[in-house]
């Protein structure tokens, strides 16, 4: 895909899908039970990877996947490590976008804790389902995003009892 098309699509709606996706990622790791078992942690990590691999901006997804690989995402073995990883990832993206973040790790936990998880999920699903792509290449990405939304729904149905609203 031409770089200008990717930039146009990413800038066109990043202000909408970007914050919604960050709320989702932070809430996924902060609102889950602190005592989850290893298989649940792996499910969570897999779902997060699916989300970042299917962002509405292919260039953003490529950066995210590269970051996860370079920072050994697969080696994360505790929930606390995963929580800090998502925080650090968000900070890295903010730096790359020349945005300033005034939140320490502890402040970010306090910031995201009050969010209503079911509303965050509904918002993400609504945003991702309502993106229209007319370009053939972008339609392929749209297909994968729809699959991601379905996977996300299944993930939360399976693990609903482990999450605080």
Feature names for model-found ranges:
Residues 1-165:
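Aromatic-rich, lipid-facing transmembrane alpha helices and their immediate juxtamembrane interface loops
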């Amino acid at each position: 895909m031409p770089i200008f098309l990717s930039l146009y699509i990413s800038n066109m709606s990043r202000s909408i899908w970007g914050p919604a996706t960050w709320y989702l990622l932070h809430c996924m790791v902060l609102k889950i039970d602190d005592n989850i078992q290893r298989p649940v942690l792996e499910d969570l990590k897999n779902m997060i990877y699916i989300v970042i691999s299917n962002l509405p901006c292919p260039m953003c997804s490529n950066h995210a996947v590269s970051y996860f690989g370079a920072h050994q995402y697969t080696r994360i073995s505790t929930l606390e490590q995963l929580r800090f990883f998502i925080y650090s990832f968000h900070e890295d993206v903010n730096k790359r976008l020349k945005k300033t973040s005034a939140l320490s790790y502890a402040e970010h936990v306090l910031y995201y804790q009050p969010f209503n998880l079911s509303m965050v999920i509904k918002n993400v699903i609504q945003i991702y389902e309502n993106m229209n792509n007319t370009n053939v290449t972008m339609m392929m990405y749209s297909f994968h995003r729809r699959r991601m939304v379905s996977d996300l729904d299944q993930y939360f149905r399976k693990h609903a009892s482990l999450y605080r609203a």
